[in-house]
Amino acid sequence: MPTVSQPKNLGDLLKYEAPNLYSRDQDTVAAAQNLSLGTVVGRETATAKLKVIDPSATDGTEIAVGVLGNDVDATLIDREDAILIARHAIVARGALVWPTGLTVAQKATAVAQLTALGVLVRDSA
């Protein structure tokens, strides 16, 4: 019997959000990145644009500000159509996308930063 493999969708990531899109912001992802739904992101202080979280950075991207709610290909230009899950939400731990090489402690720090914003990370089926 053939199997079907489907890409992740918002339902795999977002388990609860506040009514009237309160949990979501439309935001800008900085160029030179191709980010997937579920990517944990930080905000570069100088540009106010989103980038993948980088705990070793000192430009603001070391602090988690939310989780992407859609795929964003900003390889060539800044993309202003990113959906940021920024507050009052529950996301599935297994659907989060982390940069390679992050330690367990760095992930725990980022999860704590998300929790402080009201974005709870839970184990989910």
Give a label for each model feature.
Residues 1-125:
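Surface-exposed, low-hydrophobicity beta-strand/loop segments enriched in small/polar/acidic residues
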